[in-house]
Amino acid sequence: MNLILAGLLIMSILSMILAMIAFWLPNMTPDTEKLSPYECGFDPLGSARLPFSLRFFLVAILFLLFDLEIALLLPLPWADQLTNPTLALTWTTSIIALLTLGLIHEWTQGGLEWAE
């Protein structure tokens, strides 16, 4: 009990010391660059309402859908331990078929073409 109490006391004191150092140590000299919001890849002093590529948005949504497919199919190797593995195989086949049909539709509509 004394060892646990001593460890808790040491951790509490160390946490307080680190919090005080973090409060008193930082350099407080703000300038315009430090006060402006940081936007990765964009000019921070320019307009925030620049046009956004719709093609990029569609490709990003497609990436998210297929990433979700991978997340749904990852537990598939453990499906053979179920009492009815054919049901898991049926669901897996239907998910892959649905996503493949969606990909074919997107391909025929020209959604995957970057340049027109």
Swiss-Prot record:
Lineage, uppermost ranks: Eukaryota, Metazoa, Chordata, Craniata, Vertebrata
UniProt KW Membrane keyword: yes
Top-level taxon of origin: Eukaryota
Cellular localisation: Mitochondrion membrane
Regions crossing the membrane: 3-23, 56-76, 85-105
S-S pairs: none
Protein name, per record: NADH-ubiquinone oxidoreductase chain 3
Catalytic reaction equation(s): a ubiquinone + NADH + 5 H(+)(in) = a ubiquinol + NAD(+) + 4 H(+)(out)
Bilayer topology: Multi-pass membrane protein
Any Pfam family hit: Oxidored_q4
GO cellular component term of the entry, any: NADH dehydrogenase complex
Entry keyword annotation includes Ribonucleoprotein: no
Similarity section: Belongs to the complex I subunit 3 family.
Top EC class for this record: translocase
Molecular function GO labels: NADH dehydrogenase (ubiquinone) activity
Alphabetic keyword roster: Electron transport, Membrane, Mitochondrion, NAD, Respiratory chain, Translocase, Transmembrane, Transmembrane helix, Transport, Ubiquinone
Signal sequence interval, chain numbering: none
Function: Core subunit of the mitochondrial membrane respiratory chain NADH dehydrogenase (Complex I) that is believed to belong to the minimal assembly required for catalysis. Complex I functions in the transfer of electrons from NADH to the respiratory chain. The immediate electron acceptor for the enzyme is believed to be ubiquinone.
EC number per UniProt: 7.1.1.2
Ranges in a coiled coil: none
